[in-house]
Amino acid sequence: MANGVIPPPGGASPLPQVRVPLEEPPLSPDVEEEDDDLGKTLAVSRFGDLISKPPAWDPEKPSRSYSERDFEFHRHTSHHTHHPLSARLPPPHKLRRLPPTSARHTRRKRKKEKTSAPPSEGTPPIQEEGGAGVDEEEEEEEEEEGESEAEPVEPPHSGTPQKAKFSIGSDEDDSPGLPGRAAVTKPLPSVGPHTDKSPQHSSSSPSPRARASRLAGEKSRPWSPSASYDLRERLCPGSALGNPGGPEQQVPTDEAEAQMLGSADLDDMKSHRLEDNPGVRRHLVKKPSRTQGGRGSPSGLAPILRRKKKKKKLDRRPHEVFVELNELMLDRSQEPHWRETARWIKFEEDVEEETERWGKPHVASLSFRSLLELRRTIAHGAALLDLEQTTLPGIAHLVVETMIVSDQIRPEDRASVLRTLLLKHSHPNDDKDSGFFPRNPSSSSMNSVLGNHHPTPSHGPDGAVPTMADDLGEPAPLWPHDPDAKEKPLHMPGGDGHRGKSLKLLEKIPEDAEATVVLVGCVPFLEQPAAAFVRLNEAVLLESVLEVPVPVRFLFVMLGPSHTSTDYHELGRSIATLMSDKLFHEAAYQADDRQDLLSAISEFLDGSIVIPPSEVEGRDLLRSVAAFQRELLRKRREREQTKVEMTTRGGYTAPGKELSLELGGSEATPEDDPLLRTGSVFGGLVRDVRRRYPHYPSDLRDALHSQCVAAVLFIYFAALSPAITFGGLLGEKTEGLMGVSELIVSTAVLGVLFSLLGAQPLLVVGFSGPLLVFEEAFFKFCRAQDLEYLTGRVWVGLWLVVFVLALVAAEGSFLVRYISPFTQEIFAFLISLIFIYETFYKLYKVFTEHPLLPFYPPEGALEGSLDAGLEPNGSALPPTEGPPSPRNQPNTALLSLILMLGTFFIAFFLRKFRNSRFLGGKARRIIGDFGIPISILVMVLVDYSITDTYTQKLTVPTGLSVTSPDKRSWFIPPLGSARPFPPWMMVAAAVPALLVLILIFMETQITALIVSQKARRLLKGSGFHLDLLLIGSLGGLCGLFGLPWLTAATVRSVTHVNALTVMRTAIAPGDKPQIQEVREQRVTGVLIASLVGLSIVMGAVLRRIPLAVLFGIFLYMGVTSLSGIQLSQRLLLILMPAKHHPEQPYVTKVKTWRMHLFTCIQLGCIALLWVVKSTAASLAFPFLLLLTVPLRHCLLPRLFQDRELQALDSEDAEPNFDEDGQDEYNELHMPV
């Protein structure tokens, strides 16, 4: 009473008041009229009425009061980032050093006691702890310690402490009577000598807007006792900012402080207190829990320190992306909800409206106008970067508040916009997963949402938002036609929110992916579009929002009226496509402000293509778009690489660029090249052993997987079919000296040894077409010279070992780099022609022996042949044990033709079925890969069902025996069996040994080079020198036992590697498959070779196979080998007009006549090799094949330019692992 202050009813502690000086300086003339109004307000009679008639107190509405300690707590916590106002005043004395810690605590305690006493005259309007003489260093220490000086305020008529709340918003005073709202007790000013008139105004204080307007014109007026420091009076809507001359102008502080501070300080205070800085401004004024200890208690300080330690560093590292576009739609009951309409992992997938299913992935096509509107939207919309929120209601609340402050929406639309953002989300897979029992996602009403997800500020965790009921009031209806919209349940996270997730889609999303949610839609209550771009501080899992449980990092919200020209769907697709772009996605992670996002959009526009608005009749009209797009992407990558190099050259690496260096960087260490020469004898062999053999234990462990079992069964049939086919043909060529049994034994023995000792155990050793051609040529040479064929092979094998040792010692494997596709195509084309020719030649011989005659021999002649030891549809006896095969049999030629063509077409179309659209990918692969065994089985059954027609069968001995026991044994004497082997031939055998070495070297090393491609991602390495040494040395062993020489079979080896390849499941729909790993081990090779060896016991079954069926397989191998050779494609272009030529580099970068010239050179080499092969000098055809290597590197550069040779003779083909891709025959340039 002595100080002129009347305590409020209930004993509430009043705010400290400042005495008014009795003598005031004269007022300026422009404010005298306002002084009269102020005098009426502060009249003595008015205070007498207030004293005599105190206002009635309603116990049901507890009041809220703030003491000076509350404001001190606000200034000394981390929410108040600016310096105290008293620091702006001139210091009364010189700054002093900080006292010891104990002295500081004593002084704080003393100052705490002073805060409850009214200030003396002359003190600043707002008291600061420590005064102006306290160093700023002490304030930093107090902020780090997280100490709080707030004391509980006793509410009137209550025995329990009432929590002080600071609510945020500008619409508070317009919604009185809300539950839970506390009335603020305003202090009464001191009575001055000029307040002698009766009051003319109401006792209630004016509204904050009126007070702000009045104070705006009183800057020059000295301090008035009517100044108040209530937070409600300092708040303002966003529309009041930036309008100095309007009625809504706000001032950052009271008149007295404004008089003592400069304009720069006032602008800084206005920016801090009145403006909004998204991502920086703290929206919460939160007091610590009442259960914490006092300011000096270590137990009360520990939780604050723990919270500070838990704060994580900002993660600016770009992650993989998953984008989901949700549009605001009405369901069947006309209730609004968010409906997923599109998604992006790398390409766009849209939901088809009619069928509610996902369409095919495609490259998103955007309109140029939508991109410009998006850029303008981000430039003028809200951008909240590094937002520290972990719940959808918290994010939505801050987004709505930011929209209000930025004048995008009105304050009265707060509730409607918030309810719209919290509507439930639905996805196309929801109904599919429910089946006959559609699920009903759990949702709650508005009150339960607020109660469960928004605890009070005193006890809530960090980042919690104030109670939205304080700001929303009665929620407005979302849609005009639905007056009961406030009763509709909102969609909030539930326990089983992801029951309808698609597991298949989840497998295609990378593990470290972070999602982007795009929300767009039309609402009737907004007058203009409102948008917000949000980047969370860390990715959080917002349940039931996305189709799959992926943590969300980015959100984009775009709401607006329907009467605008903005296409919200196209704008949502634009931002979603931008977020799926790699460079823009990285820029969004690294952006520090709005301008970085705008710059990233400009970069995206620089790499985009605008197609004129014209009708496109066919795909040929868009052929140039892909090439132009590739050129733009190349320039874009060059710009990014230049930026990275400039950043690295500057001595530092920008945050977020480390990933780019890791992925595409030039900082990678050079790999260990297995073909690099060491300069020492057997240096390459030693490196192969040291590189590969340390992985031997893992080669055994890695085989313990079911995929290896499936690969064994598959490759077994893939290896057995060529062994039977080539074995039967080899028996025909060598007159039974080597046949099926010898080839099966050789494949089994050499396969087991190579798998156990080889450097690349994934290679499959086997017989091949070039070796068959060489065996035929060497057999004819021995017959012409009257030499023993098998004895000559012994000496050829011994010389082969010598040459292989010399080649490996000199590290000659590097020569494989000089074998270009020019030579490989000639080699493969020649072998394919030989296969096709031999097939029809064998068929011609069948028609010659069994011609189509009008009259055939009588039945007795056929019966006589049967009595001689032949069955009508059985196997002929060995040629040496019975009479020659019968001739002139009816229908034999026609049935052989049917069996051959049937086998070929079944195997060929099953291979084509592999790339068709029928069935699933895995089923098609299995059927296509087993095409040869299936065709053989079908034709054998057809032949077996026809009992009255004779067909020549495969000659297979019983048990483990040679094909012709009367001609040879398992061991071949080196000096001759029937007669002595001539010594000159022992020396001359070095020539055919050199020729067979050429074939083995080319096939083995080229196959190893294909398997070791970087695209196949083999981690354990390979060994060219060790593999060549093993195959060559085992060739010498084969000569001693009369077994065929083997080499690395290209097609079978590549098929083996593909069968053991594990593909990544986290691949975006529409993207090309990527290899996760290859199960490199030795066990599958050992098992495959062992099973092929055990097939010798199936002699009874093998003897049922007609030779015509093997001719069909031979034709199949020749035709399929031609399909993957570029030479055959260029050969067809000779007969095709230029306008129908495909878009290939060898067509677009080379003139047509020069391309045909290159093709004719290759055809000339093939014709020369064919002529040599058809003469007595056929043994020399490997040497002529080797001469094509110097022809390519010495002669062709004189005829063609380097760019032309690069287009015509470049090895740019990569393995295709797509289920619908090409098969191994189309990828390889090597013969079968």
Swiss-Prot record:
Keyword vocabulary terms for this entry: Anion exchange, Antiport, Cell membrane, Disease variant, Ion transport, Lipoprotein, Membrane, Methylation, Palmitate, Phosphoprotein, Short QT syndrome, Transmembrane, Transmembrane helix, Transport
Cell location: Cell membrane
Effect of mutating E825D: In SQT7; uncertain significance; unable to rescue heart rate abnormalities in zebrafish morphants
Cysteine pairs bridged by disulfides in the record: none
Compositional bias per record (Pro residues), positions renumbered to this chain: 1-11
Compositional bias annotation for Low complexity: 200-215
Positions with biased composition (Polar residues): 440-450
Lipidation sites (S-palmitoyl cysteine): C1165
Protein name, UniProt field: Anion exchange protein 3
Species for this entry: Homo sapiens (Human)
Taxonomy of the source species: Eukaryota, Metazoa, Chordata, Craniata, Vertebrata
